[in-house]
Amino acid sequence: MGSFLLCLLLVQLQWCLCSNVLDDLLQQTNIAFLSQQDVIGVIPVNQIPLVGVELCSMFETVGDGQDTLAAMLQTGVQTLVMDIGYDEDAGGWQMCGRTSLSEGISTVSRQIERLFPTLYANLVVLVLRGGAAEAHYEALRDAIGRVGRWTYSAEKVKATSPHLNSLLDDQEKRVLVVALDDSLCEALGTVAFGPEDVAYVEGNDTIDCSEHTDSWSFIEREFHWTDVREYVRLGCSPVITGKSVANISELEALVKVAQVWSWGAGEPALTDANSEMQRCASLGYDSATERATWKSTSCRQNLPVLCQAVNDRYSWLVGTRNLRFDQLNMDSCPSGYKPSVPRTPLEQREVERYLSEHHPSDGQYWIYLNSISVEKCWVVGGPETPCPYVALVSTRNFAAMIVTSSILVLLLLVLIILLDLVRVPIQDNRRSWKRALGSYSKAETEGVPM
């Protein structure tokens, strides 16, 4: 019995230790990226900024092979730009003239499947360059078809304009295909976006990404930590070349810098689990740089709210009253506007432009974003908005569970101590019983006739 109770105690203690480990992992999670994904989830997929790599030059720098391709996807890369061609000697399509396109696409499919049930499931855009002879069209379709389970056709995107959450969660699709060559586009048919559907420039060529609000604006060049986020902020989707990094670790760091365009450095601040002080978000405007970033803020502060036009994503105003976060509602904004948060880099750029013209001094404004319901889970809306990532109990219920578990642990510990220290009467009488049985056996032996 004591051993059984000890096992129960160990299981309980192990649960507590696992909770600590999970909490440590949460501390390491890219909370800024997850919250940004939630914010951008209602934007049409072909208007979402992406961070990608040019595979051929990247293979030259960090090495080629399927493991390298998988590692790139694990860093958070969302766009794979690849030069492809049909190799007569190999009898199939090749990627960068060195590896099988079919094998590369299979690697992409496996990596998507591995990340499918996780928080980091994301969109992957395959951008294909090269020429295709009609005789090899079917082989190309077969190669791209290896990721067909996850592919959403360009034809459907154009017809329905699905937002990111719909594509990832409702449709359970992850892949879009872009063909930058007319012959590739013809080979893939309605599956792929054509060269007329996107803007794509290389090297020192220039592009005004803000003019292409209904499609991706890719810019391929050498990027560094100091400039890559600026391109994203302007609405561009950077394609990082191999000259930008020396290894996978540097690529991962550069991708992370590029992906988070919203929060300021060191934000959102990690607060005490029992504190609700820094669980609301504000937008801070720096007049010197004319830049705005998000920051975690005490929900009890009185600030004006940032308002977005109901029918125009790029029209913004500042409310006239200073309010606490829990006081925000439709009445906090002028007619035709609502409390909101910039959901894309271009929306935030319009906020900066508006503030520079109408509120040119440094300022701080509420945005409709908070983590009041669940710590570290930043969601768009008011204090009662639930966390979309995981189903969690409230802080009060969680505290009640901890108290109950602690009491059970204490009771089990007391029982184990009692069983070890207090003798049971049957155990105390065991020697007496042995003596009685011994005497009886001896008497019975002595009574046997000779």
From Swiss-Prot:
The keyword Cytoplasm does not apply. Residues 1-18 form the signal peptide. It is a single-pass type I membrane protein. Residues 19-397 are extracellular. It comes from the Eukaryota. The chain crosses the membrane at residues 398-418. Residues 419-450 are cytoplasmic. The keyword DNA repair does not apply. InterPro entries: C-type_lectin_CS, Telomere_Capping_Maintenance. Keywords: Glycoprotein, Membrane, Signal, Transmembrane, Transmembrane helix. GO terms for cellular component: endoplasmic reticulum membrane. It is found in: Membrane. Glycans are attached at N204, N247. GO terms for biological process: cellular response to hydrostatic pressure. Belongs to the MTC6 family. PANTHER family: MAINTENANCE OF TELOMERE CAPPING PROTEIN 6, MAINTENANCE OF TELOMOERE CAPPING. May be involved in telomere capping. This is Maintenance of telomere capping protein 6. It comes from Eremothecium gossypii (strain ATCC 10895 / CBS 109.51 / FGSC 9923 / NRRL Y-1056) (Yeast).
